[in-house]
UniProtKB/Swiss-Prot annotation:
This is Segregation and condensation protein A. InterPro entries: ScpA, ScpA-like_C. PANTHER family: SEGREGATION AND CONDENSATION PROTEIN A. The lineage of its organism: Bacteria, Bacillati, Bacillota, Bacilli, Lactobacillales. GO terms for biological process: cell division; chromosome segregation; DNA replication. Pfam families: SMC_ScpA. It comes from the Bacteria. The keyword Cytoplasm applies. It is found in: Cytoplasm. Participates in chromosomal partition during cell division. May act via the formation of a condensin-like complex containing Smc and ScpB that pull DNA away from mid-cell into both cell halves. One of its GO terms (cellular component) is cytoplasm. Component of a cohesin-like complex composed of ScpA, ScpB and the Smc homodimer, in which ScpA and ScpB bind to the head domain of Smc. The presence of the three proteins is required for the association of the complex with DNA.
Amino acid sequence: MDIKVKDFEGPLDLLLHLVSKYEVDVYQVPIVDVIEQYLAYIETLQAMRLELAGEYMLMASQLMLIKSRRLLPKLVDKEPDEEDLEQELLGKIEEYSRFKALSQELASQHDKRALLFSKPKQELIFEQAVLQKDKTVMDLFLAFSQLMAAKQEAFKYNHTVIERDDYRIEDMMELIEARLELEQELTLTDLLKHCDHLNEAITLFLASLELIKRQLVGIEQTSHFGQIVLRKEIQ
C-alpha cells in the first residue's frame, strides 16, 4: 500500500508550522523545543524510508548547532555569532511567514477571478484533507514523530531480529478496530505504548492512516500539543 505524507514546501515551511502552534510572536517561542520537534520529524521520515530533500538535512545540522550551544554550560560569555545564528533563523521564519501569507492572498484572489470564467477544478487529496477539529494528517504525523523520539531508547536496546513482513498493515487495522470496539476511543500514545520495535510502531501508524482515509476512524486533538484521540466513526 502506498501512503503519501504531504510534503512541506521546504524546511522553513516545516519550522513555521511548528512555531505557529505556540500562537505567540515568533521571537517568543521556546526555540529548543521547536528544534527538537523538527529533528524528531526528520528522524521519523528517515526511519520510514521516506524521501528527504537535502535542504532539510542542512537545516537539521544548523539547528543541532544552535541547540548544542543553547544547552552547553555557559562557562564563558556568549559569543556574538551564537546569538546571531538564532536571531537569523527566527528572522528567516518571520520573513517566510509574511511571504507565505502574501502568496496565499494572491492565490485566493486568483481563484475568485477564475470563478467568473470557469468552473473551478475539483480535487480531493487525502494528504491535505482536514480531519476533525481542523486537524490534518500532518498533525497526526508530527504527533507520531514526537512519540517515536520518546521511544528511541527502548527501540535502540531491543536487538530482536524482526523480518520486514512480520507486521502487516491489514492486521494492524483489524487490531485498531478491535480495540476501538472495546474502548470507544484510544489515544495515539496508548496505541503505540506497547510497541517494542520500530517496524511495529510504523505499521500501526500507517494502519491508523488507512483507517482515517477510509473514514472508519476519526481523530481529534482539542489543543495544540494535546493528545491525539482516535475514535470509531459512526457509519
